[in-house]
Curated annotation (Swiss-Prot):
Keyword Signal annotated: no
EC number: 2.1.1.297
Organism field: Gloeobacter violaceus (strain ATCC 29082 / PCC 7421)
Protein's name according to its UniProt entry: Release factor glutamine methyltransferase
Keyword hit for S-adenosyl-L-methionine: yes
Gene: prmC
UniProt keywords, alphabetically: Methyltransferase, S-adenosyl-L-methionine, Transferase
Enzyme class: transferase
Family per similarity comment: Belongs to the protein N5-glutamine methyltransferase family. PrmC subfamily.
SUPFAM superfamilies: S-adenosyl-L-methionine-dependent methyltransferases
Length: 286
């Protein structure tokens, strides 16, 4: 016997509680599939969902049985004021990464024709957000993954930024042109290898390992970026790195030991966690 649409929603709510899933995901799924927000669903009664019942049930079943993130199931993620294409080739953009964009935009507003680098661009979220906030800036978005660059390219095209954001394939600074940049930004892999197995299944099973695993202490990529960034920054340019909770003091120490950098500070995210480490390049290093 076919389950009525309103019965499906009640069952989904019960399953969400059992699997420790935020009930808001159900309304997010409903709105994405039907175009109806929670109020319109309530006003429309059971018939509001009936035409979409089978699709809703199938997607929710995958959410439960495969621990598949809803953003991957739907192919989109809402972040800042953006609706971004995503798939398992890229990380799902997190709210904490918004602080990285804010740092870049605040600094680059005073730079005429700002030149910004986004290392490990993934979905292109940071590059797109910075470019939209700074119409006069040029952004170079770098990633080693061809599959990730396809996703980033779709998001750049979606927001009409193809002339402003340049995609480059390669490891970190390797594919960049030889010119000084105003800002180098990165949300690199920063989770210690030993902690990967303890991640939530939504992350561990579906998000790209190469974008998560930061080596034994989580800072392999951070060290490499610090080593190379100074020679790509203009004097007074900034390096801004997103880090894991608790890594801030160690990254500050790494930068403090490098004479090419100064004025090191940390920026807290929306949850009050030291999430971004920012430093200035004293001079272009060798």
């Amino acid at each position: 016997m076919r389950q009525p649409a309103d019965g499906w929603r009640e069952q989904a709510l019960a399953e969400a509680r059992v699997h420790d899933i935020d009930a808001a995901e159900i309304d997010y799924l409903i709105e994405a599939v039907t175009g109806l927000d929670r109020l319109r669903v309530r006003l429309g009664g059971p018939q509001a969902l009936e035409a979409h019942r089978e699709k809703l049930a199938a997607l929710w079943r995958r959410r439960i049985e495969e621990a598949m993130p809803l953003q991957y199931l739907l192919g989109t993620a809402h972040w800042r004021d953006l609706q971004l294409q995503v798939n398992p080739a890229v990380l799902i953009p997190r709210p904490e990464s918004e602080a990285l964009v804010d740092v870049a935009v605040d600094f680059c507003r005073s730079c005429a024709g700002a030149r910004v680098v986004d290392l490990g661009t993934g979905s292109g979220a940071i590059a797109v957000a910075v470019a939209r906030a700074l119409p006069g800036a040029t952004v170079w978005a770098v990633d080693a993954s061809e599959a990730a660059l396809v996703v980033a390219g779709a998001n750049i095209e979606r927001y009409g930024l193809s002339e402003q954001v340049h995609l480059l394939r390669g490891n970190w600074f390797v594919p960049l042109p030889t010119q000084p940049f105003d800002a180098v930004l990165s949300n690199p892999p920063y989770i210690p290898s030993a902690e990967i197995a303890a991640l939530m299944p939504e992350v561990r099973l579906h998000e790209p390992l190469s974008a998560l695993d930061g080596g034994s202490d989580g800072l392999d990529a951070v060290r490499q970026i610090i080593a190379d960034a100074a020679r790509h920054l203009r004097p007074g340019g900034i390096l801004a790195l997103e880090v894991m909770a608790g890594q801030g003091p160690t990254v500050v120490q790494l930068l403090a030991r490098d004479s090419r950098y100064g004025c090191i500070r940390t920026v807290r995210d929306w949850a009050g966690i030291e999430r971004i480490v920012v430093t200035y390049a004293w001079a272009r290093g060798s």
